[in-house]
Amino acid sequence: MMERFEKIEMKIPAKAEYVAIIRLTMAGVANRMGFAYDDIEDMKIAISEACTNIVQHAYKEDVGEITIVFGLYEDRLEIMAADNGVSFDFNSLKSKVGPYDINKPVEHLPENGLGLYLINTLMDDIQIMHDEGMTVLMTKYIQREQVENDGNPISTYKSY
């Protein structure tokens, strides 16, 4: 039997000014699902990096489209960011992705190339497909055991 989930799909122009719309939508979805604040912030960074990579690399001078699909499962949020633009040599790029030498001064860190490293670090799972264009599938699981209700109410009323 197939696992039940809900799907939200969005298409936006591959322009930097539209990335915030995706980020805000994802934050709203994750909040409604019950994700912790820190996990939502991590996912906002990851989705921003994925979309920014598309904007910068997929379409060169042309304006293309970013397709975002959110898969809402009981225990996780799956986020797919896809383009139909020019793909790049993924294996070459992957070999250059972190970890970075913490003993080197920050001035020696590359200006670009941290995106995939950040996504991989912040998300629970990441898959990248690069046939026609590029598709990044990111997964974050809900950590429900972080805050527990102990059943003892707190009162701000002071009794004398």
UniProtKB/Swiss-Prot annotation:
It catalyses: L-seryl-[protein] + ATP = O-phospho-L-seryl-[protein] + ADP + H(+); L-threonyl-[protein] + ATP = O-phospho-L-threonyl-[protein] + ADP + H(+). It holds the Pfam family HATPase_c_2. Keywords: ATP-binding, Kinase, Nucleotide-binding, Serine/threonine-protein kinase, Transferase. The keyword Lyase does not apply. Its EC number is 2.7.11.1. It comes from the Bacteria. One of its GO terms (molecular function) is ATP binding. It is an enzyme of class 2 (transferase). Belongs to the anti-sigma-factor family. Negative regulator of sigma-B activity. Phosphorylates and inactivates its specific antagonist protein, RsbV. Upon phosphorylation of RsbV, RsbW is released and binds to sigma-B, thereby blocking its ability to form an RNA polymerase holoenzyme (E-sigma-B). PANTHER family: ANTI-SIGMA-F FACTOR RSBW-RELATED (PTHR35526), SERINE-PROTEIN KINASE RSBW (PTHR35526:SF9). This is Serine-protein kinase RsbW. It comes from Bacillus cereus (strain B4264). The lineage of its organism: Bacteria, Bacillati, Bacillota, Bacilli, Bacillales.
